[in-house]
Amino acid sequence: IFGNYTTELSLKDAMEKGVVARANVYRIETNIDLSHVRFNGKDYVNADLEKSVRVTSRNELIVNVLKDYFTEGDAGKRQGIIFCINKAHTKEMARLLNTAGISAQDYSGDTKHPEKVMQEFKEHKIRFLCACDMISEGWDYPELGILVMARPTLSKVLYLQQIGRGLRRTSIKKNVFVIDVVDEYGAMVRPCSMHAIF
């Protein structure tokens, strides 16, 4: 995504120089405890995230923030991706968003007719895609304006791949909203977030 600047600029420098879209960063702080989630050498163990993170109160908090702060004005016109921990999480987030009156669709390896879903997203019939690893790399949609980081990760590579989905700068998009969902991690290694990177 950084073109010829990849080896020369940090993400912060690239934003300051206008190579990529600037990130307007928001934090949703939860009381979820990650200190007991195991680490497999690269990232959190997904089975542990399933037990600790995929809880209704956390999901509802994310939906309420989107409903309260991202449905009006410029933010209300933006489409987004919610990065989830697994397929079950994508389905639950999509269900909660639709119940709240925000059009959403789960998007994973289980999705029937994924091309149709993506076309409807590009036609603005769907506002949020709730996705897991399927959309982290190799996908580009320049109009993407909101990234919700609902999957805790210790992998800077994965985090930057996901962030990269929304950093394409266009003639009409100068910035992207990044919403970091920040859980408690105690004395353990801090999960990746925009604040941690910068």
Region annotations inferred by a language model:
Residues 26, 132, 150:
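Conserved residues at the C-terminal ends of beta-strands
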Residues 11-21, 168-198:
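A conserved SF2-helicase RecA2
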Residues 154-176:
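Conserved SF2 helicase motif VI
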Residues 4-81:
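Conserved interdomain linker/interface between the two RecA-like ATPase lobes of SF2 helicase motors
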Residues 18, 129-147, 163-168:
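SF2 helicase motor core recognition
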Residues 81, 91-136:
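Conserved helicase ATPase core of P-loop NTP-dependent helicases/translocases
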